[in-house]
Amino acid sequence: MTTTSASTTDHLIDQQVIDGQAGYTKSFLNIYDLAVFKGTAPLAWHCSPAVSRQMYDTCLGANHVEIGVGTGYLLDNATFPVADPKITLVDLNPNSLAHTAQRLNRYDVTTVRANVLEPLPLEERAYDSVGMSYLLHCVPGSIKEKGIALKHAAAVVRPGGVVFGATVLSSGVPVSARGRWTMNYLNKRGDFHNQEDNYDDLRDQLAQYFPRFQLTSRGCVGIWRAWTTD
């Protein structure tokens, strides 16, 4: 079952924000899993999709929000703690929302079109978990600027709830020659905006918005779990 909220993004949105999600066309979404989870993640970023799947299996709550939904690959392959989870999908791209909602139609799914750089149009302190995988490197600005997305995610998580995710970093982590070439190419296309994204800034943003967090890296991907105050 899928329900859809009214859009909160009808006003003008920064063009770079639009560009960062515009590549998620219906045709690209059909090959996204192959391109990302069989392609760039293991071959360019040196981060196996098994790492992300393990994070989802251990962090997902019964009432979950996914921000930047892609195709729903990770949610579709995840083990939820309950048989009938509630899932709220948040994205700026209607194609991604529709594709993922259809893929997860065995669950109770709500879609919300929203900009992660603005406060989320969701109930505060109401959700068990928020996932933000492979999102921030597509959002314009440095980590110091777009780290506000972490604040917005934290605002909707219940006390003691978890915000988790992964993002491709350009410095402070090992970047292979193939990874650097791919990163530069995607930044030139406007698909990525991570040329200023580094590990230390990500750590500082997590520390600013959460009392407790874990941050690690696999290849050039920063991976975090962060908990709100009990």
From Swiss-Prot:
Coiled coil: none annotated. Its EC number is 2.1.1.353. It is an enzyme of class 2 (transferase). It comes from the Bacteria. It catalyses: demethylluteothin + S-adenosyl-L-methionine = luteothin + S-adenosyl-L-homocysteine. GO terms for biological process: antibiotic biosynthetic process; methylation. Disulfide bonds: none annotated. The keyword ATP-binding does not apply. Pfam families: Methyltransf_12 (PF08242). GO terms for molecular function: methyltransferase activity. Disruption phenotype: Inactivation of the gene yields a mutant that can produce nor-deoxyaureothin and its C6-hydroxylated derivative, but not aureothin. Pathway: Antibiotic biosynthesis; Polyketide biosynthesis. InterPro entries: Methyltransf_12, MeTrfase_VrtF, SAM-dependent_MTases_sf. Keywords: Antibiotic biosynthesis, Methyltransferase, S-adenosyl-L-methionine, Transferase. Methyltransferase involved in the biosynthesis of the antibiotic aureothin, a nitroaryl polyketide metabolite with antifungal, cytotoxic and insecticidal activities. Catalyzes the methylation of demethylluteothin to luteothin (also called deoxyaureothin). Is specific for its gamma-pyrone substrate, and does not act on the alpha-pyrone isomer. Belongs to the methyltransferase superfamily. This is Demethylluteothin O-methyltransferase.
